[in-house]
Amino acid sequence: MATQKTFVMIKPDGVRRKLIGEIVGRIERKGLRIAAMKMVKIDRETANKLYEEHIGKSFFNELVSYITSGPVVCMVVEGDEAVRVMRTLIGATDPKEASPGTIRGDLALSKAENVIHASDAEEKAKREMSLFFSPNEITE
């Protein structure tokens, strides 16, 4: 199995609802390692870059407003097949469709405020990590 790094972000509703410890614990119990972590307030410019694939879609402005509404916790998560493992761990975007035992299935309240983001591909993970972390901030 190949060790990968992926980008994970606890969204404003997860921070507001005090779910940081619960989510980090689930990631670590899955055998993944937190290689970097910081709490930040995302500005609109960074939000536009993070969600650039959604520019022009009907929900884009609402998404940017939400993600800039409060602090988020950004992480670089490392482990065997980290991208795939994290995507499975977080569950479907809509918590009504997310399996019990997944982060969204257990913790998310709505599709709009679904607690967590995780990169869906290795190249995307690299781009998203670079928005929030310099190489010297990521531990080996």
Curated annotation (Swiss-Prot):
Functional note: Major role in the synthesis of nucleoside triphosphates other than ATP. The ATP gamma phosphate is transferred to the NDP beta phosphate via a ping-pong mechanism, using a phosphorylated active-site intermediate.
Entry's EC annotation: 2.7.4.6
Pfam family, one: NDK
Biological process annotations from GO: CTP biosynthetic process; GTP biosynthetic process; UTP biosynthetic process
Protein family membership: Belongs to the NDK family.
Superkingdom per UniProt: Archaea
Residues that coordinate or bind ATP: K11, F59, R87, T93, R104, N114
Reactions catalysed: a 2'-deoxyribonucleoside 5'-diphosphate + ATP = a 2'-deoxyribonucleoside 5'-triphosphate + ADP; a ribonucleoside 5'-diphosphate + ATP = a ribonucleoside 5'-triphosphate + ADP
Keyword terms, alphabetized: ATP-binding, Cytoplasm, Kinase, Magnesium, Metal-binding, Nucleotide metabolism, Nucleotide-binding, Phosphoprotein, Transferase
Co-factor requirement: Mg(2+)
HAMAP family: NDP_kinase
Listed PROSITE patterns: NDPK, NDPK_LIKE
An example molecular function term from Gene Ontology annotations: nucleoside diphosphate kinase activity
Name of the top EC class for this enzyme: transferase
SUPFAM superfamilies on file: Nucleoside diphosphate kinase, NDK
Record: active site: H117 (pros-phosphohistidine intermediate)
Name of the gene encoding the protein in the UniProt record: ndk
Protein name: Nucleoside diphosphate kinase
PANTHER family, alphabetized: NUCLEOSIDE DIPHOSPHATE KINASE
Subcellular location: Cytoplasm
Any single Gene Ontology cellular-component annotation: cytoplasm
